[in-house]
């Protein structure tokens, strides 16, 4: 489960960059397209709006510019609405509080940088107590659809808007029978996804997770096979390394099992398999570049995994984000790694 919580100028170290700030210093060049093997690097990241209600357009422009500099081309908005709050100019009885500029400004920045955005729907924290509650699933599917209809009315024209993200994270310990997965799939995921495809037919994604103390590779395989019977075009798997759900020595086995479930046990799934790579430690600090390189090697080394996105750039790699200097060190080290591949 997620926590809610190179040209390089020799005399201008990367720590001078400003994530979300106004910074006139020269920016390092982006990795050249076609020069970096995308099976060795991150190409996307999640973004949360919790601490960004009042960001100006220039701050969003700078943040996405700095993401693009290290090769990220995809932004996944974790949620457009959370609990009682919405981050676009829409009115709902279930989200009375509004931060109406965040989503609009992020999309404008993404258009400027020619980046793709997957927009997350509505999430309420009571999901964790109601994962198999059919009445709850029905109600919150309707709420997700309401948010999607409003988002599409406002931003459906945006060239940066490439897909949807269902922010409810399924896992095999809660959905531990075929019947429970089918209930989640049919009452919730398919109800949302079928409507999304009527609205604009953009791809729909979700991010599953697992805990190796509770789930074997074989159980994850079968769970992924059952989940992928849903109307989904992208299924991500959270690697669990940051939250301590798996030891590195077991990581490849779980990813191979997940891929086998998606494409062998369920031969009908035609969608993509992405890895959601955690760039933090159990103490929530930014991880080391050595660990992240190992994660990339193991996860993208599984043939069916087509893309690696991180959770998440702003907290773990942005020098003016919550972890400041430590995040800046990781960003510098990761940027150097990407440049070394060219």
Spans of features found by a protein language model:
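Bacterial Sec-dependent N-terminal signal peptides
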Residues: 9-36
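Boundary/entry segment of secreted carbohydrate-active catalytic domains
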Residues: 27-80, 210
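Catalytic domains of carbohydrate-active enzymes, especially glycoside hydrolases
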Residues: 58-84, 226-236, 299-309
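Aromatic-lined substrate-binding rim segments of carbohydrate-active enzymes
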Residues: 60-126, 180-206, 250-261
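An active-site-proximal structural segment forming one wall of the substrate-binding cleft
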Residues: 98-113, 133-163, 195, 224-228, ...
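Aromatic-lined carbohydrate-recognition surfaces of secreted/lumenal glycan-active proteins
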Residues: 118-130, 138, 162-169, 188-220, ...
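Active-site groove signature of glycoside hydrolases
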Residues: 122-125, 147-179, 309
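Substrate-binding cleft of secreted/luminal carbohydrate-active enzymes
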Residues: 162, 232-248, 261-342
């Amino acid at each position: 489960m997620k926590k809610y919580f190179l040209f390089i100028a020799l005399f201008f170290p990367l720590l001078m960059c400003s994530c979300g700030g106004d910074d006139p210093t020269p920016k390092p060049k982006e990795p050249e397209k076609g020069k970096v093997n995308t099976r060795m690097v991150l190409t996307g990241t999640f973004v949360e709006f919790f601490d960004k209600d009042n960001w100006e357009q220039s701050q969003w422009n700078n943040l996405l510019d700095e993401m693009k500099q290290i090769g990220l081309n995809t932004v996944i908005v974790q949620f457009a609405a959370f609990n009682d709050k919405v981050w676009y100019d829409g009115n709902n009885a279930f989200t009375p509080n509004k931060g109406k500029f965040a989503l609009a400004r992020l999309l404008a920045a993404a258009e400027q940088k020619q980046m793709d955005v997957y927009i997350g729907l509505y999430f309420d924290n009571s999901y964790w107590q109601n994962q198999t509650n059919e009445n709850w699933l029905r109600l919150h599917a309707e709420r997700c659809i309401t948010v999607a209809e409003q988002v599409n009315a406002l931003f459906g024209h945006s060239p940066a808007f490439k897909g949807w993200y269902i922010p409810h994270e399924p896992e095999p310990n809660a959905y531990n029978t075929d019947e429970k997965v089918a209930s989640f799939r049919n009452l919730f995921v398919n109800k949302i996804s079928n409507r999304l495809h009527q609205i604009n037919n953009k791809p729909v994604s979700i991010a599953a997770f697992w805990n190796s103390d509770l789930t074997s590779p074989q159980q994850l395989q079968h769970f992924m096979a059952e989940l992928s019977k849903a109307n989904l075009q992208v299924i991500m798997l959270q690697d669990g390394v940051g939250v301590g759900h798996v030891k590195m020595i077991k990581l490849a086995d779980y990813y191979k099992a997940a891929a086998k479930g998606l494409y062998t046990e369920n031969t009908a799934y035609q969608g993509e398999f992405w890895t959601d790579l955690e760039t933090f430690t159990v103490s929530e600090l930014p991880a080391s570049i050595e660990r992240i390189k190992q994660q990339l090697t193991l996860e993208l080394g599984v043939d069916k995994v087509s893309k690696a996105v991180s959770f998440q750039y702003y907290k773990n790699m942005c020098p003016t984000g919550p972890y400041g200097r430590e995040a800046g060190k990781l960003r510098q080290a990761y940027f150097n790694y990407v440049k070394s591949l060219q």
